């Protein structure tokens, strides 16, 4: 590239960047078939998803800064209903859920915001973002032409819009919000819902438009989105997408930069060459707004993860879970954004002229009176190609696009990575933990907090998702004449559960454990159990691992033991215990005593030093530690533990489950060719998640309280505090 062209290019880019900052005054946001129009100017916009609750407020400024430095124009986020309205009419907009603060930080950085209100979000988030209390509103049917649902949805949507209006955060008020989204990926659900789904979709659109935000509304994966709402694309590739009207621009709301990690699954990785290829193809085919989902994934703190979703929501994003740059992904995409901006005058002025050079090569040229940009594409997955353009040869690697912002100089090729690869590693700190333990144990059926019902009950209807844990108790009375007492053929206990994990205790001892998976959260426990003459105490601890975040008829989804529960091998054959009298208890003793807090943990006696138990189920552990020096992100290495939850200074850093090892086929990864979430997997046979992020803002200089609840039984002596840093 000539020095003259490079200098000229940087001047143009600087002018474009400066113009993007000028939106602190009131502006008009419209659109035509080419692009969004802001203050009368068509824009090519690069966006990235950063979900505010998946990091801490202290992390937000740096994440937004890195997004801007990476070449983004827009930050995109969902709005998380269950975080903002934990109980009907009681709203929460503080700490990690301070949406207004997050939006203002985006504005201060000179970026726009795409506000996806939903309020259904999916997002691998607990219950898809819906508050669980919504399920128990009389007559409730989710996401269809149902009056109770529409009333609740409209109320929350209006709450968010009114709040943002009051803070003057829409672009037309001088704020950063240039787009709002209503519903989310409803198109596939609409067909399943039939006429009621169609009516609901129409109502949703009309309701949103009636809120008068002054900026365009969008609906993703909604082919029949009515005018003026823009229908948008989600997927790994969207170059072939066309909106449902020639008067609407081509917007891509989710370009998946990787994929989520599930407990029991391998870690997905999407090569940056393929991401860049997908973006270039979208732009060369007339796309004008592209959002990376995710640009920063973050962490599913607390119990916010969807069913079987790992605590880490890293997503193989350009900024990793800890807020560090993932290289070369971040820098390679940054260079792509620079060259797209250099092409912007041509891209927004004309439609492309397309020349086919065979089955697998194409040239897209955008030529106006004052500018020219060309995209040279090679779709072959195995062979490079040399193409001639305007009398000059250009060499294109397989599965790549070269971009010429002056129709002459190759500034960028999607498969030619110039940025260095920087590998991150977890380095143990000098922190030494001195552990104390407290035995949760199996409670009795007559202790405080238990209640009795005939037959089995659904778990979430009792817990209302305030805890992962729900106990089922019953007595099994064995007569002295039972034949198995003499033969030693212990009877077979079989339990069918809607999920997600189950611990079976017989007379206070763990008899076995069973658990499901994301692909099938239901489980069956079937095991011979040892019973004695007289009354035998059966205690079943049912454990939820998040609630489903996708699908239809949320009001029908169940968790816990619904039966049948049978005992086979008694004299009379098989006992169906499902309709017996059962006792129930919500949550754990340790939860009721708030053992995860300083006050709660100080109120009970803990076993110390040589008396600390290991490999024992239902055990609480605590220790204290000082914050290591430096500013590197911190994490807990939980490799020697089984399953449970972790708290630091009262903050729940999420569910841990390192004992659930990753299945899948991990092999060589070739960037070329169509990507899907099962391609380019890593860490097969290892824990799906070993390290758990501990935000530094949650720590004190000295005396931090670390509390762990361990369900399965682990060895806390193997836990270490590590720093994440570059090799």
From Swiss-Prot:
Disulfide bonds: none annotated. Ubiquitous, with higher expression levels in roots and siliques. It catalyses: Hydrolysis of terminal non-reducing beta-D-galactose residues in beta-D-galactosides. It is an enzyme of class 3 (hydrolase). It is found in: Secreted, Extracellular space, Apoplast. Gene3D superfamilies: Galactose-binding domain-like (2.60.120.260), Glycosidases (3.20.20.80). One of its GO terms (molecular function) is beta-galactosidase activity. The active site is at 185 (proton donor), 254 (nucleophile). One of its GO terms (biological process) is carbohydrate metabolic process. Its main location: secreted. Glycans are attached at residue 255. Its EC number is 3.2.1.23. Residues 1-27 form the signal peptide. Keywords: Apoplast, Glycoprotein, Glycosidase, Hydrolase, Secreted, Signal. Induction: By sugar starvation. It holds the Pfam family Glyco_hydro_35. One of its GO terms (cellular component) is secretory vesicle. Belongs to the glycosyl hydrolase 35 family. This is Beta-galactosidase 2.
């Amino acid at each position: 590239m000539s020095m003259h062209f490079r200098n000229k290019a940087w001047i143009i880019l600087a002018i474009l960047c400066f113009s993007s900052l000028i939106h602190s005054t009131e502006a008009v946001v419209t659109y035509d078939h080419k692009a969004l129009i802001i203050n009368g100017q068509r824009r090519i916009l690069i966006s990235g998803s950063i979900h505010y609750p998946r990091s801490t407020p202290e992390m937000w400024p740096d994440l937004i800064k890195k997004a801007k430095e990476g070449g983004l124009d827009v930050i995109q986020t969902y709005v998380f209903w269950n975080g903002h309205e934990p109980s009907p009419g009681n709203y929460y907009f503080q700490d990690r859920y301070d949406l207004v603060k997050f939006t203002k930080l985006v504005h201060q950085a000179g970026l726009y915001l795409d506000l996806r209100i939903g309020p259904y979000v999916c997002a691998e988030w607990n219950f898809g973002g819906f508050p669980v209390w919504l399920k128990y509103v009389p007559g409730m049917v989710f996401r269809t032409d149902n009056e109770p649902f529409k009333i609740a949805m409209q109320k929350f949507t209006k709450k968010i819009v009114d709040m943002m209006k009051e803070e003057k955060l829409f672009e037309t008020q001088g704020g950063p919000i240039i787009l709002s989204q209503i519903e989310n990926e409803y198109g596939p659900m609409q067909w399943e819902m039939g006429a009621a789904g169609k009516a609901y979709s129409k109502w949703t659109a009309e309701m949103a438009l009636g809120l008068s935000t002054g900026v365009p509304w969008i609906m993703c994966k909604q082919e029949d989105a009515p005018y003026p709402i823009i229908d948008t694309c989600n997927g790994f590739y969207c170059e072939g997408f066309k909106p449902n009207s020639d008067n609407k621009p081509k917007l891509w709301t989710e370009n998946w930069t990787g994929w989520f990690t599930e407990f029991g699954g391998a870690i997905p990785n999407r090569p940056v060459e393929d991401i860049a290829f997908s973006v270039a193809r979208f732009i060369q085919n007339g796309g004008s707004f592209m959002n990376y989902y995710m640009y920063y994934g973050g962490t599913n703190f607390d119990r916010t993860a969807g069913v079987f979703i790992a605590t880490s929501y890293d997503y193989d994003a350009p900024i990793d879970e800890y807020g560090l740059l993932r290289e070369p992904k971040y820098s390679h995409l940054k260079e792509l954004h620079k060259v797209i901006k250099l092409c912007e005058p041509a891209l927004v002025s004309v439609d492309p002229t397309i020349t086919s050079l065979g089955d697998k090569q194409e040239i897209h040229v955008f030529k106006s009176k004052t500018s020219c940009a060309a995209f040279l594409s090679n779709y072959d997955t195995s062979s490079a190609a040399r193409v001639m353009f305007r009398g000059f040869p250009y060499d294109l690697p397989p599965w790549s696009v070269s971009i010429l912002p002056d129709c002459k100089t190759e500034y960028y090729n999607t498969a030619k990575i110039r940025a260095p690869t920087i590998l991150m590693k977890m380095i143990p700190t000098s922190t030494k933990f001195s552990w104390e333990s407290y035995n949760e144990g199996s409670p009795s059926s007559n202790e405080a907090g238990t209640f009795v019902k005939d037959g089995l009950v659904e778990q979430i209807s009792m817990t209302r998702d305030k805890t992962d844990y729900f106990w089922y108790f019953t007595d099994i009375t064995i007569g002295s004449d039972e034949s198995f007492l003499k033969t030693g053929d212990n009877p077979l206990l079989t339990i069918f559960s809607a999920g997600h994990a189950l611990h079976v205790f017989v007379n206070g001892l763990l008899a076995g454990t069973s658990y499901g998976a994301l692909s099938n959260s239901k489980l069956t426990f079937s095991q011979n159990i040892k019973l004695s003459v007289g009354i035998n105490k059966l205690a079943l601890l049912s454990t939820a691992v998040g609630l489903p975040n996708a699908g239809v008829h949320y009001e029908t989804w169940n968790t816990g033991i619904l039966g049948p529960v049978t005992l086979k091998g008694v004299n009379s054959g098989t006992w169906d215990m499902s309709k017996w009298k059962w006792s129930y208890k919500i949550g754990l003793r340790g939860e009721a005593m708030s053992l995860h807090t300083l006050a709660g943990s100080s109120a009970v006696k803990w076993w110390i030093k040589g008396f600390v138990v290991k490999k024992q189920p239902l055990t609480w552990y605590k220790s204290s530690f000082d914050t290591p020096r430096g500013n590197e992100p911190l994490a807990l290495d939980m490799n020697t533990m089984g399953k449970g939850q972790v708290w630091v200074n009262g903050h729940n850093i999420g569910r841990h489950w390192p004992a659930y090892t990753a299945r899948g086929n991990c092999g060589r990864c070739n960037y070329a060719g169509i990507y899907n979430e099962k391609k380019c997997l890593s860490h097969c046979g290892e824990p799906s998640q070993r390290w758990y992020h501990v935000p530094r803002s949650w720590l004190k200089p000295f005396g931090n309280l670390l509390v762990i609840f361990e369900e399965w039984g682990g060895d806390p002596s193997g836990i270490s505090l590590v720093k994440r840093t570059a090799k």
